[in-house]
């Protein structure tokens, strides 16, 4: 018995091994598709990287997981600004060593890997598709089987046929489903579409064979599994006209074109009865679009009534666009009806930027300028918002909108950049547990939502089911110090924590130490404090769930408050720099022509319409802690605190379809600040858009909110003895 106890003790003392890495299957990429922008290893095995479109690359392999991922960028210093691995819901953070990042992936997933807030049409992005093991090819003599290799020409199946596209099979052409029924496309093949559409105008709407990656006309009962669509032309990626009964599973669509337009992910022109599941889309326009028809831009074409679109389900998918909406219904002057649309259990990685007449959103319904039709019973449920622009833009006047539900919408870190709108004859619009971080929106102001044009007030549903919320103790901490997380109790619930540093825990009350001050996106070194995206998932025994998120700052170095002995007064002083710059210039090389002061980020340009502004003064920090600052502006803005550049918005991004001005741009940064006054310097460009920069802050005991005027002060003019600029 003693020997048995000693053996048991020895076994218990052994370290617990991590799950063994799984075997993977990865087909070779043909030389003409191979990319050198990144090299990738999975479980130590090199996997070919393929070039998709624009500056997008992708890698694809199959296995059960787990997977040890190693990615090396060829561009020197590529990861120095940080790393953004999405979906954020997965809580992934890599280890960075020079040009290489490494992380562990538990199982099959579809990822976007880029640098923080770099996801527009010229971004360098790597998409990673870790697929579940592929079922064997069906053994039927009538199957058209294509082995690995390069094929030049389109696929034109006939009714009743099944095509099997083996992993490693590449087709330069289209999949044409023209008046066919009961067709199956199986396997893991790739279609590369390089059409001859005019790259400077919209010809992609046409319903023609060989005009899209997948084109369908009056097709019925189609199943497409495991297909990758690469779209390099300015055309709709997948178009279905008056077609019904389509099922897509494990679809991967990547589109990019220099015009950054008219490259939707999937369009219905009439028809429906469709299911899209477990799929990935990167579009250069709307990801999904519902129209009754589209026959051209003449008055006759625009006013011709279209066919109904109905019964569409999209679920368990990962969605991204470089510019437009995730889902769009309608268009000005168009007439058609739609009903029974559901998007659920999906991740919105990149939810548009700017406007085309109407601001872009997760959901846009644009029934303006005499558009007619009834649109009913739309549900958006269990959606995770990463980088997004607005939630909903809805306008329909004749006869109207009814039955739109937004339930369990979780914005995990970033605030909305513009408000949502509801205009015209709209009713029964319901917001049920729309959350921004930990805060649940309970009113128009909290969403925010603007209601006009006779629309009925939106309904905000009272809390029900499990509630995800948590506290942090202590609220201020340095890297390596213990932090206690406590979730609000929910009946019969399980609690799962993702700390944003690549680790997880379970339980209502857990302890954790953040390993460094780099933050989830590995961008904290430049400011001395890292923001970790902490997520809490609460699920009860019936499967009802809720999520909460909060950005917590681990402090690496403190910034001391400044002792100000001279007399001060409220507000900031400012200087005006006239000029016709297209981007924010280096104001150290420019000369201000006049100055003044204001209560906050306002200025009087005295008639100038093209100018830059610099605001200077002090920011009063209420308590010691880690603070995050969110900067929003259309033409370009920059924030400096205590001489450290905290945030700088990206270059101006023009709105389209004659919408005036530039899109709202966004950046954020974090600092460890002691209570008291800290020097603040803000720059803003006024070139083609209206409005001044917006500055929001959050910190210990301080929810995300606009920096109030009371927090600003500046030296009284008679106390100024010297001048300078950060």
Which role does the model predict for each range below?
Residues 464-558, 609, 696-701, 719-726:
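Extracellular/lumenal mature domains of secreted and surface-exposed proteins
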Residues 110-112, 484, 531-535, 626-628, ...:
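Short, conserved beta-strand segments of beta-strand-rich sandwich/propeller modules, principally
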Residues 545-546, 551-552, 556-726:
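Acidic/polar, compositionally biased interaction segments
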Residues 1-9:
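Sec-dependent signal peptide recognition
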Residues 21-465:
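Extracellular/periplasmic carbohydrate-active domains that bind, remodel
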Residues 9-18:
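Hydrophobic h-region of N-terminal signal peptides that target proteins for export
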Residues 115, 538, 682-684:
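Conserved structural position at the C-terminal beta-strand
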Residues 63-68, 478-484, 624-626:
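Short coil/turn motif common to extracellular beta-sandwich-like domains
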